[in-house]
Amino acid sequence: MSITSVPGVVDAGVLGAQSAAAVRENALLSSSLWVNVALAGIAILVFVYMGRTIRPGRPRLIWGATLMIPLVSISSYLGLLSGLTVGMIEMPAGHALAGEMVRSQWGRYLTWALSTPMILLALGLLADVDLGSLFTVIAADIGMCVTGLAAAMTTSALLFRWAFYAISCAFFVVVLSALVTDWAASASSAGTAEIFDTLRVLTVVLWLGYPIVWAVGVEGLALVQSVGVTSWAYSVLDVFAKYVFAFILLRWVANNERTVAVAGQTLGTMSSDD
């Protein structure tokens, strides 16, 4: 018996094809995705070229973490375009679009759960933070992304959507707190304060945009009910928070390898008592 003949079971291939077709038919939505595929591809080539002379050690680690950002992004955006990581969900009672089927780009949360830790890893290496702080912040970041996905995909009750949203924001506060306080102090001690401050401001300002877009978009209050407009908002944030951020960081590292290399050996260094 074919799986498509089993009652209640839907062919995943059919759903994927339908989702991909729906994305292609929405010019606003598809253009927001293709732009990022193109920019991510360009970023990969540029970053590989920039890293050709970067020496082993911390500079090379920063380069590796930074290169992963567009690599993850291009994979994710292709997943969205193919319909693999796009689905339809019915909004719960109390939502502005209650009872309506809304297209969810849940693959974005998968992207953020993989790419934002790389951003934080690169920043942590730049600031020469201790391993415990780096682990805590990256764990909080992943928690932020996972609970954000839960907020977007929960359909049982509107209260649960906003509860997950609040938890995600709480994780976000942990990340922001580290960037503004402890990590800034570490960067000052490491001699990388100037570039770290620039990247920190860029990261904090842009990352604050994501929960705002969620809140006003179709997933939240639905003040903006166009999935295409919401997708463009996320895509623009991604361009600056990922590719522009990464280019600024790599250009500085390539020109200041000695500073990065001698800034400290906190990460990966074992205690002399071991």
Curated annotation (Swiss-Prot):
InterPro entries: Arc/bac/fun_rhodopsins (IPR001425), Rhodopsin_retinal_BS (IPR018229). Keywords: Cell membrane, Chloride, Chromophore, Ion transport, Membrane, Photoreceptor protein, Receptor, Retinal protein, Sensory transduction, Transmembrane, Transmembrane helix, Transport. One of its GO terms (cellular component) is plasma membrane. The modification N6-(retinylidene)lysine is found at residue 242. The chain crosses the membrane at residues 26-51, 58-81, 106-127, 131-154, 158-180, 193-216, 227-255. Pfam families: Bac_rhodopsin. Chloride 1 binds at residue 105. Chloride 2 binds at residues 111, 115. It is a multi-pass membrane protein. Belongs to the archaeal/bacterial/fungal opsin family. Homotrimer. This is Halorhodopsin.
